[in-house]
């Protein structure tokens, strides 16, 4: 069986300037801001399991994911949350789990923490091993 991938995007895009987006992100996370989202183009009623990933922003899920997870009815669904971060995971997975259950998920399983380098010149270097990531993906298949 295949999978369907849907991107969660804000209606108003973030700046491409690193300093501007980090300042904006810090403010939004601290305020619990939930931005307006573009439609994902997928009817979640057709799925039993939903895998949701987020970058970690100031120890929490990104505002777009907070907005999405707050607005979705997960009744009868199994939710698999994952996060990416550079060494400071915070409460992201716990928060995602609580929100999924609050919105009706029957089960939250196989939550995954994916770590990248915190070295500014190597931020795209994944520190979680490919073997570990492949094993997690295999569990989900």
Model-derived regions, located:
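N-terminal beta1-alpha1-beta2 submodule of the flavodoxin-like/Rossmannoid cofactor-binding fold
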Residues: 1-52, 59-61, 66, 70, ...
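Solvent-exposed loop/turn segments at secondary-structure junctions
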Residues: 10-13, 56-60, 85-89, 114-119
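Short glycine-rich or small-residue beta-strand-to-loop segments that form or flank ligand, phosphate
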Residues: 48-54, 79-83
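Short, glycine-/small-residue-rich phosphate/pyrophosphate-handling segment
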Residues: 80-116, 123
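A short acidic/glycine-rich loop-to-helix N-cap element
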Residues: 120-128
């Amino acid at each position: 069986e295949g999978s369907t991938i849907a991107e969660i995007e804000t209606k108003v895009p973030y700046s491409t300037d690193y300093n501007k987006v980090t300042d904006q992100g810090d403010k939004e996370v601290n305020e619990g801001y939930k931005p307006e989202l573009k439609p994902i183009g997928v009817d979640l009623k057709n799925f039993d399991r939903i895998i949701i990933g987020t970058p970690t922003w100031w120890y929490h899920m990104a505002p777009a994911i907070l907005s999405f997870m707050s607005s979705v009815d997960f009744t009868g669904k199994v939710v698999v949350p994952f996060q990416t971060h550079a060494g400071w995971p915070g409460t992201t997975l716990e928060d995602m789990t609580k929100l999924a259950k609050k919105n009706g998920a029957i089960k939250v399983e196989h939550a995954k923490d994916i770590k990248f380098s915190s070295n500014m010149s190597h931020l795209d270097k994944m520190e979680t091993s490919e073997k570990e990531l492949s094993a997690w993906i295999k569990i989900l298949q």
